[in-house]
A protein has these predicted regions:
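Membrane-interfacial helix-loop-helix connectors in multipass membrane proteins
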Residues: 215-240
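Residue-identity detector for glycine
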Residues: 3, 9-13, 30
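Hydrophobic alpha-helical transmembrane segments of polytopic membrane proteins
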Residues: 237-260, 457, 461-462
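Long, hydrophobic alpha-helical segments
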Residues: 107-119, 147-173, 177
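Transmembrane alpha-helical segments and their membrane-interface loop/helix boundaries
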Residues: 18, 23-147, 265-475
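Helix-loop-helix units of permease transmembrane domains in multi-pass membrane transporters
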Residues: 36, 46, 165-203, 469, ...
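Hydrophobic/aromatic residues in alpha-helical transmembrane segments
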Residues: 163-167, 253, 269-270, 465
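Selective transmembrane-helix segments that form parts of the transport pathway or gating/packing helices
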Residues: 50, 150, 154, 158-159, ...
Length: 475
């Protein structure tokens, strides 16, 4: 009995050892097979003329656009410095908006929304002037499409198309040529083959994106007008990560299309149609829908609202204006009347600004609605995220305008001080204009939900490709 137990123990021990060795051998072989697939895919991509053409075009476009945009940024920065240094004591206050350094990579709305604004107790506009001209931002604020060539444009258009042309036949071409059937005949796991194709293709795409990013950074570093600090570098790193997620969406989309269609030409046609819809047609349709669903008041309606809001104070305003005009003509200074003149004009300016601010908020709601409709478009998500990280989106401008409004109240109080305590008025120094901005970390955290959506799109497409490929009849 003891001998039987010993023999049984030896058999079980031998079985466990053999099983362990087989598992290790399978994992080693599987690991070697996966490495071989990845290596083969990388070499195939690198030898492709499509990759070489796309890479060269990307490097040229990124280098040239970054250099040109730096020149534009340098001019705007010099205009800003000249304007702030030449400020003199005068009626009203001029406020200048500093250009964003990362507008060289992601122009966004930085240039379109103007650079300067002049305020006084008589005037508090809701738009800036400069660059595009006063009120030009109303026409450019929510335009969707290819408005400028920069790093973001190259990623959004050129690199995404390059990814499609590289990956559209990653599975279908092998199916058409019969090489996929031979691979399956050698007991190569389907999931491992698809995963190897995914890793190999993703490596090449990320390498191309990294080269493009390094070219842009190199141009910025070598240019004397650009100073890169740790905050800016962190933002650039965040933009690289978002660009990788964006390109990953089109790569996994190409994989699933390539597994569904056996003919590469059909797959390419489908992918190009999808690209045109999600990158061009759908974003512009979302803007048109938002304009139709959220109607904005016309200029005449705004003027009517202003008159109606100010109607209770119109009589007092007219009487004060008439008395103040007579005082000016008579050259007799009445401090109380002068202060009252400032009060009634500031009151009218503030009430009018309420109407203008409401109109501006409606514009913002329209933009947010268009963006929410367009969230299914990877390009809309990508633009929204990188503009927020670069500080060139509409929210940055809105923060600037909030700072302008706060500064207006300070300037109005200073104007009143002239007629109550002139000595204090002369000694009073207007505080430097400031407005709150988001740090790089705050911007990345704020855009995290949209970044997760891009990641989930890639996961969804890859899982779909895996499911289709596992059930595909290779023949």
């Amino acid at each position: 009995m003891d001998g039987f137990q010993d023999s049984l123990g030896q058999i079980c021990g031998s079985f466990v050892i053999c099983t362990h060795e087989l598992i290790i051998q399978y994992l080693v072989i599987g690991d070697l097979m996966l490495k071989a697939i990845i290596k083969r895919e990388i070499l195939e991509y690198l030898k492709s003329s499509k990759f070489l053409i796309g890479l060269c075009l990307t490097i040229i476009l990124v280098g040239m656009s970054t250099f040109i945009n730096i020149g534009d940024y340098q001019q705007r920065q010099q205009d800003y410095l000249d304007a702030t240094q030449n400020l003199q004591e005068q009626f009203g206050v001029k406020i200048f908006r500093k250009p964003q350094v990362l507008s060289t990579l992601v122009q966004g709305r930085d240039r379109e929304l103007g650079s300067q604004i002049e305020i006084s107790f008589l005037r508090l506009p809701i738009q800036t002037s400069g660059y595009m001209g006063e009120f030009a931002s109303q026409h450019h604020r929510y335009v969707s499409g290819f408005t400028s060539v920069d790093f973001a444009f190259v990623v959004r258009v050129v690199l995404s198309l390059m990814v499609i042309f590289l990956a559209y036949n990653s599975v279908s071409e092998e199916t058409a040529q019969g090489t996929l059937r031979l691979s399956m005949a050698n007991a190569l796991p389907r999931g491992q083959l698809l995963f190897g194709k995914f890793i190999g293709g993703l490596f090449v795409i990320l390498a191309c994106l990294t080269i493009a990013t390094l070219v842009a950074v190199l141009v910025m570093v070598l240019h004397p007008a650009i100073m890169l600090d740790s905050e800016t570098c962190l933002r650039i790193l965040g933009m690289w990560m978002i660009s990788a997620l964006y390109l990953g969406v089109f790569f996994t989309l190409s994989l699933i299309v390539s597994t569904i269609f056996n003919r590469p030409s059909i797959g390419l046609l489908v992918l190009l149609q999808v690209w045109i819809v999600v990158n061009v047609i759908y974003p512009n349709v979302s803007v048109i829908l938002s304009q139709q669903l959220i109607r904005l008041p016309g200029q005449e309606e705004l003027e009517d609202r202003k008159r109606a809001l100010f109607e209770p104070f119109q009589r007092q305003f007219s009487e004060t204006q008439e008395a103040f005009t007579k005082m000016v003509k008579s050259s007799d200074i009445d401090m109380e009347l002068s202060k009252k003149n400032v009060d009634v004009n500031a009151q009218r300016t503030e009430l009018y600004h309420r109407i203008d601010s409401e109109y501006s908020r409606q514009l913002t709601r329209q933009m947010h609605f268009a963006r929410n409709i367009g969230l299914l478009s990877p390009s809309v998500l990508y633009d929204s995220i990188v503009q927020r990280i670069a500080g060139t989106d509409i929210r940055e401008f809105d923060k600037f305008m909030e700072g302008v409004e706060r500064h207006w109240y300070k300037d109005t109080e200073r104007a009143k001080l002239m007629y109550t305590d002139y000595k204090a008025y002369q000694e009073y120094k207007m505080p430097e204009f400031t407005y709150s901005t988001q740090s790089a970390v705050e911007s990345l955290v704020y855009t995290l939900p949209e970044s997760i959506v891009l990641f989930l799109l890639s996961v969804f497409f890859f899982v779909g490709a895996h499911t289709v490929f596992m059930r595909k009849n290779i023949g």
